[in-house]
Amino acid sequence: MTKNHLFYKKIGIVFLLIASTLALYWQVSGFDFVGYDDSLYISLASKDLSLSSIAWAFSTLEFANWHPLTWLSLILDYNLFGSDPSGYHITNLIFHMTNTILLFLCLHAMTGSLYRSAFVAALFALHPLHVESVAWVSERKDVLSALFWILTMWAYVSYTRKPGILKYATVFALFAIGLTAKPMLVTLPFVLLLLDYWPLARIRNGYVVPANILPMEKKSIPFLLLEKVPLLALTLSSSIVTYIAQNKYHAVASLQHASIMHRVLNAFNSYVAYLGKTIWFQDLSAFYPYPKSIGIVGGGSSILLIFSMTLLIASLAKTAPYLATGWFWFLGTLVPVIGIIQVGSRAMADRYTYIPLIGIFIAISWGLNHVLERRPYRKPLAAFAAVFFLSVCSVAAYHQASTWTNTFTLFKNALDLNWSDYRAYNIIGVATEKNGDHERALYYFQMALKTNPQYDPAYVNAGNTLRKMGRIDNAIHCYRKALQINQ
């Protein structure tokens, strides 16, 4: 394939990626903010672009996180779009499209495989599990941090092919910037080690680098580990700041709330659930409540499945190194949010898969090619399978995105999937009260308290509504109940 021919093919793929992403997500330009952190994020970001705003972004620990770059991007949006949600949604979409294109180009630069890289990028663009990160304005940190994750990987590829201090400094700087968008990037040094194994083949593993890719100089494992020390220092610093922020806002659950065993079982159940939803993406929700109890049989089965798959993939590492990289990418990048250190009261979240699923997509794309490589009509079979699965993804993702139209559509969908979701009742109640329907709002607050009598925000919101209705004695009773719960 000539360079010109390859260039035009890449342009064509980029065009298809942009077109398909726009076809799926342009609907978000007409979406409202949702009553799930959006109003608070936008309210806090309603500042002029000034040195004091920049200082605030770098000093605040609001929402139990330190992510100044995310705050600055939202402040910029506020100065461009004011309170119009359309602009914020389009910004998220632009970041997602950019990430999709960069992921394709970065994977192609690493592997030399044009169509497999394109399939991974298309899965990244169109998978229903990624809807939450794109359609939810508050998840700006996902799409923004992923941009720097991919740029860091690409800079790392350049560094490994022609090492130098300036190139390493670029890797370091991009990683540092990415951590200011979302601390979940702390696992990136681990993923760079996986890339050293495959596809960069910097470790002796029997993997033959494609002829169109410049071969890497083989390095010892101690050297590769030492090479990551400056990046690991950034990981440690970010982890410490994140822990301080989450402790300050009491976001970390105590062992009384969830024992170590309970957390471990939930973590493995979540791994299995993420894998299941990757292939069979039904019952996607904005909130998955943390389970009060987990059966040993169910949790044990999840542990057995994950360990069995890990052993199987490790045994295939020589013949299918992409499986090892993809699988351990998935497992490793989910560690900060898998719940061993439990933050909040959710069991899992679709948004947590934005970067981790790239590993699974790599395994699927290269695995499909591997399975079909000796079969007749390999290329048309692979193309049909890829187009079919992407079509199913697109239809499901389009429907899932529509649930994010506004607060009511989002949380009525959550209640359709889990009628006892007390947070959903409370959030719908707040939105209903803002619309002036006090009686209906009160019903939702009562439903929240019926499903969780210890949920004090519902008492506070019910009290506020009763006060507006002139029922002062009832309002005082609700406020007292909220205070009793918080004592």
Spans of features found by a protein language model:
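Short, intrinsically disordered, charge-balanced linker/junction segments flanking boundaries
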Residues: 470-487
